[in-house]
Amino acid sequence: MQWLAIGLGAAFGACLRGWLARFNPLHHWIPLGTLGANVLGGLLIGLALVWFERMGSGLSPNIRLFVITGFLGGLTTFSTFSAEVFTFIHHGRLLAALGLVGLHVGMTLLATALGFYCFKLVL
């Protein structure tokens, strides 16, 4: 049952990631789909951390596997992000690479904190 929860979650997350990838060509140095997937993943993991903390042991472990390992694992794009940064470096665009790293890390951390604290206020 655990593998099914992870697999189904990953399928949904990957589908959303694929849809978001359509936005990558809209800007010449910021792959917006990748950034959107990572920022959304950061926001959702913040929400999930609070939700799972509040639900405690009354929640099936398979739900956590579905959401965090599956869905968010399928949605977020660290390997794609790494490839995009490397491509900038490889083409001599070091400032663009550094800017992209700062943008992804900074916005994802902010989104995680936003999701965490906003959801904590609601619950």
Curated annotation (Swiss-Prot):
A GO biological process of this protein is: cellular detoxification of fluoride
Membrane topology listed for this record: Multi-pass membrane protein
Q: Which reaction does it catalyse?
A: fluoride(in) = fluoride(out)
Superkingdom assignment: Bacteria
Q: Does the keyword Ribosomal protein apply?
A: no
Tell me the keywords, alphabetical order. Cell inner membrane, Cell membrane, Ion channel, Ion transport, Membrane, Metal-binding, Sodium, Transmembrane, Transmembrane helix, Transport
Q: Which GO terms describe its cellular component?
A: plasma membrane
What is stated about the way this protein's activity is regulated?
A: Na(+) is not transported, but it plays an essential structural role and its presence is essential for fluoride channel function.
**Any one GO MF annotation of this record:** metal ion binding
Q: Where does it localize? A: Cell inner membrane
What parts of the sequence cross the membrane?
1-21, 32-52, 66-86, 94-114
Coiled coil region boundaries: none
The protein's role, per its UniProt record: Fluoride-specific ion channel. Important for reducing fluoride concentration in the cell, thus reducing its toxicity.
Alphabetized HAMAP family for the sequence: FluC
> Would you identify the family this protein belongs to, as annotated?
Belongs to the fluoride channel Fluc/FEX (TC 1.A.43) family.
Task: Tell me which PANTHER family the record gives.
Answer: FLUORIDE EXPORT PROTEIN 1-RELATED
Q: What is this protein called?
A: Fluoride-specific ion channel FluC
UniProt organism field: Psychrobacter arcticus (strain DSM 17307 / VKM B-2377 / 273-4)
The gene it comes from is: fluC
